[in-house]
UniProtKB/Swiss-Prot annotation:
Membership in a protein family: Belongs to the RNR ribonuclease family. RNase II subfamily.
Reactions that this protein is recorded to catalyse: Exonucleolytic cleavage in the 3'- to 5'-direction to yield nucleoside 5'-phosphates
One term of GO molecular function: RNA binding
SMART domains according to UniProt: CSP, RNB
EC number(s) per entry: 3.1.13.1
Broad class of the protein's primary localization: cytoplasm
Organism: Psychromonas ingrahamii (strain DSM 17664 / CCUG 51855 / 37)
Keyword Transferase applies: no
Listed name of the protein: Exoribonuclease 2
Stored NCBIfam families: 3_prime_RNase, PRK05054.1, RNase_B
Length: 656
């Protein structure tokens, strides 16, 4: 009787038009219900029954029922799903086949298209898969998915890293191209330096060796030659291989695992500066005076070289840092020893010159996670920066400064690493903060490289960790640009990296630009969006690195929750909810909520974790601050999220 009744349809439409509507994003919880969050900051409750129609992250239109605090959102129209593609675990129980999303906030029953053929295609219970959402519950009958690919077998102990890489849409294996590896720039003249005794210093297991060094002392100081492997001699511009390298942007490094930017035929073989192998390189010879200052114009040129010595950081550091070595320790030949001692002298002078005239970072240790065959941490090495690291770092920094100036002068374009110092809107805060420590400054001076560098040198003399942390939080973000700009944090006018072209796409581009100057060509242009492309790729890689480390640390430390082990930790962040600390012995990060800063959690409201001041304040007294090194203990491990919850070894005292 009422079916297809136009009056009834019109009435229904009118009623719906009269109901208030809101557009926003769905935020799920682990308790079944959720919220609709609008762009204007309003939140509307979504009951569990309605949450079955939507997914976490969906952008929807919703009817708003009720008023005030009791108003609820009823999902009505999907604008865009936040889960078009996601990672899930396959569950096969006899004839019942389903998936459980890796993200615990993705609730709902997901049907699988073609599920009955999965087992015959080699899929097993527990396998990890990438799935595509074919239809949405708001647009039809439930959620229908389709498997795109298998990511990892259920039995793979290293599945977590493949899952992490897939979650961030990163490549999980080396690119493969059927390509004849021939020199594509025969017009570039290459000097024959195969008899010059270049050497490499890398990790013991490094395969993609891209820099070699040679040094001579002269009456004015030193002549340093930096030879960099030249993959641009093999990778054609605008080719499919070049496009893939641009998409990846960097080689991805995870514990015991890497995914190269270039095919391994290049990265680990033809372009790796292996001992005794003839390789195409781009070289830079730099003259440095006895004060450690770069003098004159650096010389860039193509060359064929052979690495005469493959060295590692540990052996070189042990040799340079010890006057006497036991018979079983590595010792260089007479020729190599002279080079190492000469480069050691240069690097010390160069570091001192930069300390006096530029800006120098405080050295931080490296943490190396050693894994067993189960994919778990077997050992964590805390490795301080040693003399061999200084040799390489000072050489590379000098070479990159030279490249920045060279490209700025000859091309007015390139891939420049830039940094504008303190954020412009925070300069007033910087001036006020510095005045508290007796340092006079002004906004205009701080906005220049010279002024910023001078302030950095003054603050370094104070050796005040609290001030260093506060200033760091007032800095702008580093950026990558295609036109020359200063790098305040290094204290230089230009900085363009070209020393890692095997593993960084920006460095590969700079190789092409430097060579275009040598060949007097003007056919290479750097896109305006190159900085956005490289920054976005690096952000994803850092998220993947963080996620893998969180998983490994949580597995490694979960059995220490009940122990009374005390860790030395430095406070590096203070937010309203608590503090974040870095464990000095293993590099792990603990979060300590306010409730675990004191003995009685009910006293947490009396603790002011002041983010603006970087201090923990109780009754107007500073109890803790950024840069403090304190004793902490592990309180809880959230394995699912990889979060480590800590507590103070000695709780803060709360007065009555």
């Amino acid at each position: 009787m009422f079916q297809n009744n136009p009056l009834l349809s019109q009435l229904k439409k009118q009623i719906q038009e009269d109901i208030p509507k809101r557009q926003g994003k769905v935020k799920a919880t682990d308790r079944g219900y959720g919220f609709l969050e609008t762009d204007k900051g309003k939140r509307f409750f979504i009951p569990p029954s309605e949450m079955k129609k939507v997914l976490h992250g969906d952008q929807i239109n919703a009817f708003i029922r009720g008023k005030g605090d009791k108003s609820t959102a009823e999902p009505n129209q999907l604008k865009k799903t936040g889960s078009a593609v996601f990672i899930a675990r396959l569950v096969i129980k006899q004839k019942n086949i389903s998936i459980i999303p890796k993200n615990p906030l993705l609730k709902g029953f997901f049907k699988i298209k073609g599920s009955q053929s999965l087992q015959s295609r080699g899929y097993q219970d527990g396998d990890w898969v990438k799935v595509e959402l074919v239809s949405h519950a708001l647009e039809g009958n439930g959620f229908l998915t389709q498997i795109i690919e298998k990511i990892a077998d259920a039995s793979d102990p290293f599945a977590y890293r493949l899952l992490t890489v897939a979650t961030h849409n990163l490549a999980n294996k080396a690119p493969e191209f059927d390509h004849p590896w021939k020199i594509i720039d025969p017009q570039l003249s290459r000097s024959d330096l195969t008899k010059t005794p270049f050497f490499t210093i890398d990790g013991v297991n490094t395969q993609d060796m891209d820099d070699a060094l040679y040094i001579e002392a002269d009456e004015n100081g030193w002549k340093l030659t930096v030879a960099i492997s030249d993959p641009s001699a093999y990778v054609p511009e605008n080719s499919d291989m070049d496009a893939e390298a641009k998409r990846r942007a960097f080689t991805l490094y995870l514990p015991n695992f890497n995914v190269p930017m270039l095919p391994r035929d290049l990265s680990d073989s033809l372009c790796s500066l292996k001992e005794g192998e003839k390789r195409a390189t781009l070289c830079c010879t730099i003259h440095i005076n006895k004060k450690g200052e770069i003098e004159g114009e650096p010389a860039f040129y193509g060359a064929w070289i052979k690495s005469h010595y493959r060295l590692n950081y540990t052996d070189v550091s042990n040799y340079l840092e010890n006057e006497e070595l036991s018979n079983d320790c590595w010792k260089p030949s007479t020729q190599l020893a002279e080079q190492l001692r000469t480069l050691d002298s240069l690097s010390l002078k160069r570091l001192q010159w930069r300390t006096d005239n530029n800006a120098v970072f405080k050295n931080q240790p490296d943490y190396t996670l050693k894994l067993n065959n189960k994919g778990e941490i077997s050992e964590i090495l805390c490795e301080p920066r040693r003399s061999a690291n200084r040799l390489v770092e000072e050489s590379m920094i000098a070479a990159n400064i030279c490249a920045g100036d060279f490209l700025a002068k000859h091309k007015q374009q390139g891939v420049f690493n830039t940094h504008s110092g303190f954020s412009s809107e925070r300069l007033g805060k910087v001036v006020s903060l510095l005045s508290e420590f007796g340092i006079e400054s002004d906004i205009q001076t701080l906005a220049t490289v010279t002024g910023y560098t001078k302030i950095r040198q003054q603050t370094n003399l104070l050796h005040n960790s609290y001030l260093d942390h506060r200033l760091r939080k007032l800095l702008s973000y580093a950026d990558i640009k295609n036109t020359p700009e200063a790098h305040f944090t290094l204290g230089v006018d230009h900085y363009a990296t070209w020393t890692s072209p095997i593993r960084k796409y920006g460095d590969l581009l700079n190789h092409r630009l430097i060579k275009s100057v040598l060949l007097k060509e003007d056919n290479i242009q750097i896109d305006n969006e190159i900085g956005q492309v490289l920054n976005a790729a690096r952000k994803l890689q850092r998220l993947a690195e963080r996620d893998v480390n969180n998983i490994l640390y949580s597995q490694y430390l979960k059995n220490q929750v009940e122990s009374k082990w005390r860790y030395k930790a430095e406070i590096f962040d203070i937010i309203k909810a608590g503090i974040r600390v870095k464990i000095q012995e293993n590099g792990a990060t603990f979060f300590i909520p306010c409730s675990l800063l004191c003995k009685d959690s009910s006293d947490a409201t009396k603790i002011d974790c002041n983010q603006a001041l970087g201090k923990v304040i109780i009754a107007q007294q500073t109890e803790l601050q950024l840069g403090d090194v304190i004793d902490v203990m592990l309180n809880n491990v959230k394995v699912e999220s990889g979060q480590l919850i800590g507590k103070l070894a000695e709780s803060l005292t709360i007065s009555e």
